[in-house]
């Protein structure tokens, strides 16, 4: 009887202590040697969420993902330390690319990041083929479409913040 109660108690404790986790497995070419890479709040880069060592561009983060938030990776050893923005959403993310065009790195693995990638891809395509006025108008149309389609989730909240600050998602 005591052992059954103990097993039940341990099971409940284990279930309650499970937290959503975001694992980021990165591989960025152009980061030779070893150093530190930092995960910071995308809207206030003075807030460091986590840090990890990289070796020849390979790194791994494991952070709490109770609520998806937009984060940015930075690396002080690079001429432009800002690398890429994405959501620390529960699941395993793969981040690959080159530090020369790190803002265009590929982040995949969760529906929220895939949705962000889709918005950015559409904006980039339109940006490449349009005048400045048309670009701004189409970007706002895309923001509005995504806001309407993602009402109330982390993607829409961060798109609003980007538009208020006049930012492209890669900036």
Residue ranges and their predicted role:
Residues 1-28:
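Bacterial Sec-dependent N-terminal signal peptides
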Residues 120-124, 151-166:
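Amphipathic alpha-helical repeat scaffolds of TPR domains
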Residues 18-146:
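A non-transmembrane, solvent-exposed segment enriched in polar/low-complexity residues
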Residues 10, 49, 138, 151-152:
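Generic detector of ordered secondary-structure context
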Residues 167-171:
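Charged, long alpha-helical assembly modules
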């Amino acid at each position: 009887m005591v052992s059954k109660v103990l097993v039940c108690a341990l099971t409940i404790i284990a279930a309650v202590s499970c937290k959503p986790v975001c694992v980021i497995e990165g591989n960025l070419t152009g980061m030779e040697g070893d150093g530190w890479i930092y995960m910071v709040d995308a809207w206030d880069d003075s807030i460091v969420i986590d840090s990890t060592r990289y070796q020849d561009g390979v790194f791994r983060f494991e952070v709490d993902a109770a609520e998806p938030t937009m984060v940015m990776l930075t690396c002080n050893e690079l001429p432009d330390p800002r690398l890429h923005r994405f959501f620390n959403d529960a699941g395993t993310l793969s981040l690959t690319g080159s530090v020369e065009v790190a803002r265009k790195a590929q982040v995949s693995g969760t529906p929220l990041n895939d949705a962000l990638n889709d918005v950015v891809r559409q904006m980039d395509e339109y940006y490449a083929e349009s005048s400045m006025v048309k670009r701004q108008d189409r970007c706002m149309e895309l923001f509005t479409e995504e806001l309407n389609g993602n009402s109330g989730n982390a993607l829409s909240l961060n798109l609003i913040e980007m538009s208020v600050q006049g930012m492209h998602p890669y900036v």
